[in-house]
Swiss-Prot record:
Physiological role: Endonuclease that is involved in the suppression of homologous recombination and thus may have a key role in the control of bacterial genetic diversity. Acts as a ribosome collision sensor, splitting the ribosome into its 2 subunits. Detects stalled/collided 70S ribosomes which it binds and splits by an ATP-hydrolysis driven conformational change. Acts upstream of the ribosome quality control system (RQC), a ribosome-associated complex that mediates the extraction of incompletely synthesized nascent chains from stalled ribosomes and their subsequent degradation. Probably generates substrates for RQC.
Record flagged with keyword Cytoplasm: no
Keywords linked to the UniProt accession: ATP-binding, DNA-binding, Endonuclease, Hydrolase, Nuclease, Nucleotide-binding, RNA-binding, rRNA-binding
Name used for this protein in its record: Endonuclease MutS2
Gene that encodes it: mutS2
Top-level taxonomy: Bacteria, Bacillati, Bacillota, Clostridia, Eubacteriales
GO biological process: mismatch repair; negative regulation of DNA recombination; rescue of stalled ribosome
One Pfam family it belongs to: MSSS
Length: 793
């Protein structure tokens, strides 16, 4: 990417914002080397990485990057055979622990393929960390127990030091006290000494190690402890040698993990960089741009990331319906800001950064981005000479190769307007032929006409409010800019006579074009008002529709709840009836064990008839259901009318007039219920109501009960796989149904197996009064796996 472009568009300031959000020096190095990529897949990967980091922070998950150090120098020194000091080793241990914590955090996340892949490069280093922490404490000092030898040496040193202190304490408190400057013991050159007044040098035999700045005090090692000091010095040398040996061993362990440590540092740098990108995206309220392979740029509500305070967002595009955009308008109206925003957005997107813009923003991957904006100054200063502009444009034309975005500020300015406009049109035409996407700002009215007469060239302008005499900073695509000089002068107080006279100096063509442009601006302003009103009305209509849908949904839910409640009540009644019937049957079974077989069969038949009647009260027949579906929505219902309850699929009679809420009381069999008119249909008179003519219908059904039962019932029951108790219960019910169905004989399949089930069935049949006889199955009947029972008539 062109270095001058990066400098002019202030890409370095974006990198500074990124660097402020890194947690390690490793991450900052990645930021410093950041440059826009020109490979589509690489840009896509960078954007996805930023989105993953942003999602973590959006979810309240901060990436744990604390405790990580740049160990590259430490590792290199260890690899060369150098010895790391305890502080360096402590950095290694801290980084190992932090790497492990970071790895675990990323592995626990879902939907982050790029960051998860980076986490696989992070080492754990359990053994290395344990070895270092066993030898080095949290203050960066080698522990006494780092080795048995070191522990013994330091123990001996403490004993010797205590003995020396005791002897020196006795010395300074004894007869020699009067010779001392102060009654203290201090250390010089690693040896214990006492401060002796210089005039008493001869009275204190010993070795002089130092003298005070004033010369009045000598620091003397008394002869009584010289030997002990010598012993202490020897122990100190041994301590140093043992510490060096320990540090060398730990350094060799670091060297052994060199490759893994360097891979970890590389992953840490990239993760820290991704974290910074995610933070910046959140802080600037950015969105991930949609990447496209075509060299286009489409910005929705884009905000220049370096501008402070309230920024008016811009909407602009190029490369879709046109390839050259000519922006006109007043100074300080935002033309240069628009140029810089477009260029910087492309650089940021190709560097993998999200953009401070709205959803729908699309960016293609440009191989080159060129700018000619002022004298490479900031947004607030964009003036330059004609020669400076032209020199840079020549450089751009010479370097132009692949798909490029070219941004030209005040094209052709700084020279004769006629020649400058001609040059500007020629340059734009040349760039268009070379396939570049070009955005140029200008004051020349000739370029407005040029844009209207060329294909894939479009006008744009920055809006100016003549009422307030201030620019609005809005960029209007398709509308050429107007100087507004006459109107502004009039509003500022210039004599109308002078303004009118000035208009006379314009050529007829110039005046016609200026009037046309002002008319376009007026029409656009009116259309903007109408569009705003239409948007307001559409929003109001949408709100009303949502309110209606909400109320309709509430009504639907209430109706469904009512239907469900009624259905539950019906099911409860049916369940109660079934329980009562089963209770009667159970009682009859118990009683009939002591009664004659005929009486027992009659009681069972009676009980099942009761069950059938209860079922018919709440469950309509198939014929009734078909009849009910022929009903119509009722009008003018009155008590006694026959109706169908749609939600329950049952019929009944109206018992009351509709109330204020449109509900009536309906009798359906044994069930009385309040039903909405919207849930009713008028039933035909031929269609029997639930509970109406019940006995007759029961008799009609009863006539064919045995025949129907016999026709539908299987003459065999399969007990295989059942426990004995469960099997006997099924046999008992099966025999009841078989007797009711009038079956002459039945087959009971129990399988061969161990024979336990067959024995239990045989024993039950032996004592059952419904069974006349029984036998094992014959050839073709299942053999010993089947028992055939003949029932009493």
């Amino acid at each position: 990417m062109d270095e001058r472009t990066l400098r002019t568009l202030e890409f370095a300031k974006i990198k500074e914002m990124l660097a402020e959000r890194t947690a390690t020096s490793l991450g900052r190095e990645v930021v410093e080397s950041l440059a826009p990529a020109t490979d589509f897949l690489e840009v896509q990967h960078r954007q996805a990485e930023t989105s993953e980091a942003r999602r973590l922070y959006e979810g309240g998950h901060a990436i744990p990057l604390g405790g990580l150090h740049d160990l590259r120098a430490h590792v290199q020194r260890a690899v060369r055979g150098g010895v790391l000091d305890p502080g360096d080793l402590l950095d290694v241990a801290d980084t190992a622990a932090s790497s492990r914590r970071l790895k675990r955090f990323l592995e626990e996340q879902e939907g982050l393929p790029i960051l998860t892949a980076l986490s696989r490069m992070l080492g754990t280093f359990h053994h290395l960390e344990a070895e270092i922490r066993q030898a080095v404490d949290e203050h960066g000092e080698v522990r006494d127990d780092a080795s048995p030898a070191l522990a013994e040496i330091r123990r001996s040193m403490r004993i010797l030091q205590n003995r020396m202190k005791e002897r020196l304490d006795a010395f300074v408190r004894g007869s020699a006290a009067k010779y001392l400057q102060d009654p203290i013991v201090t250390i010089r050159e690693g040896r214990f000494v006492v401060p002796v007044k210089i005039e008493y040098r001869a009275q204190v035999p010993g070795i002089v190690h130092d003298q005070s700045a004033s010369g009045s005090t000598l620091f003397i090692e008394p002869m009584a402890i010289v030997e002990m000091n010598n012993d202490l010095r020897e122990l100190a040398l041994k301590e140093h040698e043992e510490v060096e040996r320990i540090l060398a061993r730990l350094s060799s362990l670091v060297a052994g993990e060199a490759d893994a440590l360097l891979d970890t540092l590389q992953a840490v740098a990239q993760i820290d960089f991704a974290s910074a990108k995610g933070k910046l995206s959140l802080d600037l309220d950015c969105t991930e741009p949609e990447l496209v392979r075509e060299p286009i740029l489409e910005i929705h509500k884009g905000r220049h990331p370096l501008l402070k305070g309230r920024v008016v967002p811009i909407d602009v595009h190029i490369g879709i319906t046109f390839d050259t955009l000519v922006i006109t308008g007043p100074n300080t109206g935002g033309k240069t800001v628009a140029l810089k925003t477009m260029g910087l957005f492309v650089l940021m997107a190709q560097a993998g950064l999200h953009l401070p813009a709205g959803h729908g923003t699309r960016v293609g991957v440009f191989q080159q981005v060129f700018v000619d904006i002022g004298d490479e100054q900031s947004i607030e200063q964009s003036l330059s000479t004609f020669s400076g502009h032209m020199t840079n444009i020549i450089r751009i034309l010479d370097a132009l190769e692949g798909p490029a975005l070219v941004l030209l500020d005040e094209l052709g300015a700084g020279t004769d307007p006629t020649e400058g406009a001609a040059l500007a049109m020629s340059i734009l035409e040349h760039l268009h032929k070379r396939g570049a996407k070009t955005v140029a700002t200008t004051h020349y009215s000739e370029l407005k006409t040029y844009a209207y007469t060329r294909s894939r060239v479009e006008n744009a302008s920055v809006e100016f409010d003549v009422e307030t005499l201030r620019p609005t900073f809005r960029l209007l695509i398709g509308v050429p800019g107007s100087s507004n000089a006459f109107e502004i002068s009039r509003r500022l107080g210039l004599s109308p006579h002078i303004v009118d006279r000035a208009r006379q100096f314009l050529t007829q063509e110039q005046e016609r074009v200026e009037d046309l442009i002002q008319g376009i601006h007026a029409t656009r302003a009116e259309l903007e008002k109408e569009r705003a009103e239409a948007h307001r009305l559409r929003a109001e209509a949408q709100r009303m529709r949502e309110e209606y849908e909400r109320r309709y949904g509430d009504a639907q839910r209430k109706a469904a709840e009512t239907v469900e409640k009624a259905r539950a009540q019906a099911q409860q009644i049916l369940a109660t009836a079934r329980r009562e019937a089963e209770a009667v049957i159970a009682e009859l079974k118990q009683a009939l064990r002591e009664q004659r077989e005929a009486e027992r069969m009659q009681a069972i038949q009676s009980a099942r008839s009761r069950l059938a009647r209860a079922r018919q009260a709440v469950e309509p027949t198939e014929e009734e259901q078909r009849a009910r579906r022929r009903g119509e929505v009722p009008r003018g219902l009155k008590p006694g009318d026959k109706v169908r309850v749609v939600s329950l699929d049952t019929t009944g009679y109206v018992l009351s007039e509709p109330d204020a809420d449109g509900n009536v009381l309906v009798q359906a069999g044994i069930l009385k219920m309040t039903v909405s008119l919207t849930d009713l249909e008028r039933a035909s008179e031929e269609q029997p109501a639930a509970g109406a003519g019940g006995p007759a219908r029961m008799r009609t059904h009863g006539k064919g009960l045995a025949v129907s039962k016999a026709r539908e019932m299987s003459p065999e029951v399969d007990l295989r796989g059942l426990m004995v108790e469960e099997a006997l219960e099924r046999v008992d019910k099966f025999l009841d149904d078989a007797v009711l169905a009038g079956l002459p004989q039945v087959r009971i399949i129990h399988g061969k197996g161990t024979g336990a089930l067959r024995k239990a069935v045989t024993e039950a049949l032996r004592h059952d009064r419904r069974v006349e006889s029984y036998r094992l199955g014959g050839v073709g009947e299942g053999g010993d796996g089947v028992t055939v029972a003949k029932l009493r008539e």
